[in-house]
Amino acid sequence: LFLYDDCEDTPEVSASEFFYRWASKISSFLHEPSPFGQLYKCDTRLRPYGKSGALCNSFSMFDRYVRESAWVWERLALTRCRPISASTEWCYQFFRIWFASLFSRPFTPDDCREVVRMRFRIEQEKGVEKLKAGPGGLVDVEFIAQTLRLKHGKENPTILNPFTTAAIQ
């Protein structure tokens, strides 16, 4: 997920085009094979509006999307996000927006039912014999932790640690 501060366009290039180029270069670098293998697997589909959305979004676009349009699975994934930036202030700004948008709407019983449906879909696709995806496996632990973060994170921010074991404790 690539985000940037809301900023003005320049006569030479729009902010969205500038940051699109920047995000494309970083993504290519991360995917480029090296003698030691791929540096990092970066799934760029995890962004507002998926593959059809902009590769890099402004804070305000991200905020609006999460508040108004994000699917339950996207909100679950966002409970584990960790910003990477050279600027501590940018990270603080991101967390303020992230917290406000993620908890702008309650986690409803319908959302909980959707989590259960997602879990069963994964089990059907991966099979119950898989240690990670089978009953009681890592997928169950992750779904429980992420669901609890969305349900109780606003009132108890200490559970918002992106590391599952720390959040559960």
Predicted regions and their residues:
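A nucleotide- and high-energy phosphate-metabolite-utilizing enzyme signature
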Residues: 1-169
